[in-house]
UniProtKB/Swiss-Prot annotation:
Functional note: Catalyzes the conversion of L-lactate to pyruvate. Is coupled to the respiratory chain.
GO biological process: aerobic respiration; lactate metabolic process
NCBIfam families xrefs: L_lactate_LldD, PRK11197.1
Taxonomic lineage from the root: Bacteria, Pseudomonadati, Pseudomonadota, Gammaproteobacteria, Pasteurellales
Membrane protein topology class: Peripheral membrane protein
Predominant location: membrane
Identification of the protein by name: L-lactate dehydrogenase
């Protein structure tokens, strides 16, 4: 099929990737209301067009935690990313590296830290959950440091997993899931060969290395469910702050008071995120949550925003709402599932071109120029 926009990759991935993996990325929790609002709330934000300004020298680059980024975005941590393309985390990391943006490796990646880090030139970021098994956390941090990971992304909005009903229907979970996945592989032969056969082993690389045995896809949800820690508090993060010398970002902030706590804690950044609508359904979209958080802590801590970003215009919207940078999750997974590394590189090119158009027609030469004034206050119309 013809790919003319990043959204086309979703349809391409739906055709190529078996349902149990496509819907794992595409779906949200419960009735998926927050998942829908993440997208619609961004779409409904109007940009303020300004013309007859000299926009011949336009710059989308930023500096974040001492790193130069070609555009204000980071590839977000996505679990089991290696099931969307052969050794998918490596391909996505190489695409990000080639386009000058960071890649964040998930705790529950298929490819382990030691496989991904040597495949790229720039340091990758590493994402970690708060888990009951503190030994695993310490081991993961030590390995991330040894591999040269530059920034730690600490996900705090998963003390318990959300209920993802769509996974029950698709075969990711639910009755007869194993045989349903096998049958789906027969109807998706290219994926079955490229990922199912050539992409082995299908284990959680970081977990398997620590456990000394293979932890596969069937163990994935069970292992996470058993290890999520509902007793987590800011105090539990103190030993990590002492252990990790580099930048530390707290992911999963939706309330200004939590953002202030992150500043007091000494975090270097936060990610305003509802986990892509995959945790508590019914919470605010990131676009709605972002402005009051920016009012509370802008300038005291770096603000990254994710959830609902589907094009370069959405990145500009998030920046105008108060973010310093953004994270892309589903957008790059669709591209990865559809066309591997090349797909992710092309998707990033598309996003950057769309940013150029939006910045030109809102008369913002640099990322620092993008302020709330780039938006139209529809309540006054």
């Amino acid at each position: 099929m013809i790919i003319s926009s990043a959204s086309d990759y979703r349809e391409a991935a739906r055709r190529r990737v078996p349902p149990f993996m496509f819907h794992y990325a595409d779906g949200g929790s419960y009735a998926e209301q927050t998942l829908a609002r993440n997208v619609s709330d961004l779409e409904n934000i109007a940009l303020r067009q300004r013309v007859l300004k000299d926009m011949s020298e336009l710059d989308t680059s930023i500096e974040l935690f001492g790193e130069k980024l070609s555009m204000p975005t980071i590839l977000a941590p996505v679990g089991a990313c290696g099931m969307y393309a052969r050794r998918g985390e490596v391909q996505a990391a190489q695409a990000a590296d080639n386009k000058g943006v960071p890649f964040t490796l998930s705790t529950v990646s298929i490819c382990p830290i030691e496989e991904v880090a040597p495949a790229i030139k720039r340091p990758m970021w590493f994402q970690l959950y708060v888990l009951k098994d503190r030994g695993f956390m310490k081991n993961a941090l030590e390995r991330a440091k040894a591999a040269g990971c530059s920034t730690l992304v600490f996900t705090v909005d998963m003390p318990t997993p959300g209920a993802r009903y769509r996974d029950m229907h698709s075969g990711m979970s639910g009755p007869y899931k194993e045989i349903r996945r096998v049958l789906q592989g027969f109807t998706h032969p290219f994926w079955a060969y490229d990922v199912g056969i050539k992409g082995k082993p299908h284990t959680l690389g970081n977990v398997s290395t620590y456990m000394g045995r293979q932890i596969g896809l069937d163990d994935y949800i069970g292992w996470l469910t058993e290890n999520f820690d509902p007793s987590i508090s800011w105090k539990d993060l103190e030993w990590i702050r002492e252990f990790w010398e580099g930048p530390m970002v707290i992911k999963g902030i939706l309330d200004p008071e939590d953002a202030k706590d992150a500043v007091r804690f000494g975090a270097d950044g936060i990610v305003v995120s509802n986990h892509g609508g995959r945790q508590l359904d019914g919470v605010l979209s990131s676009a709605r949550a972002l402005p009051p958080i920016a009012d509370a802590v802008k300038g005291d801590i770096k603000i990254i925003a994710d959830s609902g970003i589907r094009n370069g215009l959405d990145i500009v919207r998030m920046l105008a709402l108060g973010a310093d940078a953004t994270m892309l999750g589903r957008a790059f997974v669709y591209a990865l599932g559809a066309a591997g590394r090349q797909g992710v590189e092309n998707m990033l090119d598309i996003f950057k071109k769309e940013m150029h158009v939006a910045m030109t027609l809102t008369s913002n030469r640099t990322i620092a120029d993008i302020k709330p004034e780039a938006l139209v206050d529809l309540s006054k119309l």
